């Protein structure tokens, strides 16, 4: 019996070492060499080097002086990240969207962009379409006492245009740049 068990245990040990130790170390080493920023979480730091967040995870910004991220079904907690799973016919979804739209609505700006009232699939989407960021520019400029053109230029300079897919604005990076502006 041990004769039959020995090759199985040896295979288990070898495969465990290869797949559980060697392969992860190899992939981590290659990632650190080829993509160090991404391998370490795409962290955004302030001037002193303090980590403020990741380019990959949304944060909640309250107050009129900040650009707001998309709503989060999990209150921006990475542990409970998820979509709301509410059906389009669910009255609770309609109520939440109406409440969020009322909070985001800016007079004479037209309808609130969909991205500002709907959650993303993960509930932690860090990006907005440029039109959703531009929609908030007037509110942010007014609250901060800044010229609207300056805030609009800031949105434009933080608009990322990937090779494939729509243009996006990272809300955390935009708010960090906004915090660095002189009032």
UniProtKB/Swiss-Prot annotation:
It comes from the Bacteria. This is Potassium-transporting ATPase KdpC subunit. The chain crosses the membrane at residues 10-30. GO terms for cellular component: plasma membrane. The gene is kdpC. It is found in: Cell inner membrane. Pfam families: KdpC (PF02669). It is a single-pass membrane protein. InterPro entries: KdpC (IPR003820). Keywords: ATP-binding, Cell inner membrane, Cell membrane, Ion transport, Membrane, Nucleotide-binding, Potassium, Potassium transport, Transmembrane, Transmembrane helix, Transport. Its main location: membrane. One of its GO terms (biological process) is potassium ion transmembrane transport. GO terms for molecular function: ATP binding; P-type potassium transmembrane transporter activity. The lineage of its organism: Bacteria, Pseudomonadati, Pseudomonadota, Gammaproteobacteria, Pseudomonadales. It comes from Pseudomonas aeruginosa (strain ATCC 15692 / DSM 22644 / CIP 104116 / JCM 14847 / LMG 12228 / 1C / PRS 101 / PAO1). Belongs to the KdpC family. The system is composed of three essential subunits: KdpA, KdpB and KdpC.
């Amino acid at each position: 019996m041990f004769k039959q068990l020995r090759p199985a245990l040896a295979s288990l040990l070898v495969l465990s070492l290869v797949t559980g130790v060697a392969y992860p170390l190899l992939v981590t080493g290659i990632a650190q060499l080829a993509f160090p920023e991404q391998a370490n979480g795409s962290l955004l730091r302030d001037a002193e080097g303090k980590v403020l967040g990741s380019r990959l995870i949304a944060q909640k910004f309250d107050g009129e002086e900040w650009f707001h991220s998309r709503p989060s079904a999990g209150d921006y907690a990475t542990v409970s990240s998820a979509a709301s799973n509410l059906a389009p016919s669910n009255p609770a979804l309609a109520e939440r969207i109406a409440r969020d739209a009322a909070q985001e609505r800016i007079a004479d700006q037209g309808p609130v962009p969909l991205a500002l009232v709907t959650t993303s699939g993960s509930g932690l989407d860090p990006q907005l379409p440029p039109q959703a960021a531009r929609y908030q520019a007037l509110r942010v400029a007014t609250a901060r006492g800044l010229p609207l053109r300056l805030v609009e230029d800031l949105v434009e300079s933080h608009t990322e245009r990937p090779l494939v897919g729509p243009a996006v604005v990272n809300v955390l990076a935009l708010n960090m740049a906004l915090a660095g502006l002189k009032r």
